[in-house]
């Protein structure tokens, strides 16, 4: 069992069935080249889950919907762009591993045995934000999926799930692995 604490959550991930890109030697060699990664990955029920967790609780007094959701004719918010980069780069790393490219072989070497072969993916972003901003979750989810639609289609992923911490902790798919920090 591997236990991680991040962004107000404790993750208890199954031995031999999880990884963090950040811990892979191949990723460490590439990370200085503007490559990003999702926080956690684990296998459950024949699917590979990629999870990014973000807590905006500390910046709740200054955060607005415009800090999260792109508006037509304006610069894309950096928080939104960071999520796009993390998902896209994580998909690229997995697809490279499964395609056995030179870099992909190095990435594959660090993956659990079950993740070394192509498998169905679930992309999940869990966000903690104050209730005053929760009204923006659906807009953020829709904007994120619109921007990612072509990219995720290349990996046979239908959509990105964007949920708040309460839904993450209440969902049986995740509650076996994820708890709120005490």
Describe each PLM feature range.
Residues 1-38, 172-182:
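Basic, amphipathic N-terminal segments that precede the first structured/catalytic domain
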Residues 1, 132-182:
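Polybasic (Lys/Arg-rich)
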Residues 40-42, 49-55:
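Conserved catalytic cores of phosphodiester-cleaving nucleases, focusing on short active-site segments
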Residues 49, 59, 132:
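Flexible, glycine-rich phosphate/dinucleotide-binding loops
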Residues 56-126, 146-158:
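Catalytic cores of nucleic-acid endonucleases
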Residues 33, 42-45, 116-118:
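Flexible, charged surface loops at secondary-structure boundaries
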Residues 127-131:
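Short beta-alpha junction loops
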Residues 47-49, 122:
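Structural motif
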């Amino acid at each position: 069992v591997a236990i991680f604490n991040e962004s107000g959550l404790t993750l208890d991930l199954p031995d031999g069935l999880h990884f963090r890109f950040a811990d892979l030697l191949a990723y460490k060699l590439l990370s200085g080249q503007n490559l990003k990664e999702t926080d956690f990955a684990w296998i459950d029920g024949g699917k590979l889950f990629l999870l990014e967790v973000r807590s905006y609780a500390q910046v709740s007094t200054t955060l607005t919907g415009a800090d999260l959701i792109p508006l037509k004719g304006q610069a894309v918010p950096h928080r939104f762009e960071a999520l796009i980069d993390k998902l896209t780069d994580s998909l690229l790393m997995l697809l490279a591993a499964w395609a056995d490219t030179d870099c992909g072989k190095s990435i594959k070497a660090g993956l659990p045995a079950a993740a070394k072969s192509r498998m169905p993916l679930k992309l999940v972003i869990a966000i903690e934000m104050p209730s005053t901003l929760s009204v923006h979750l659906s807009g953020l989810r829709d904007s994120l999926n619109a921007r990612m639609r072509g990219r995720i289609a290349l990996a046979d992923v239908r959509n990105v799930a964007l949920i708040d911490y309460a839904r993450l902790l209440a969902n049986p798919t995740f509650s076996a692995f994820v708890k709120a920090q005490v």
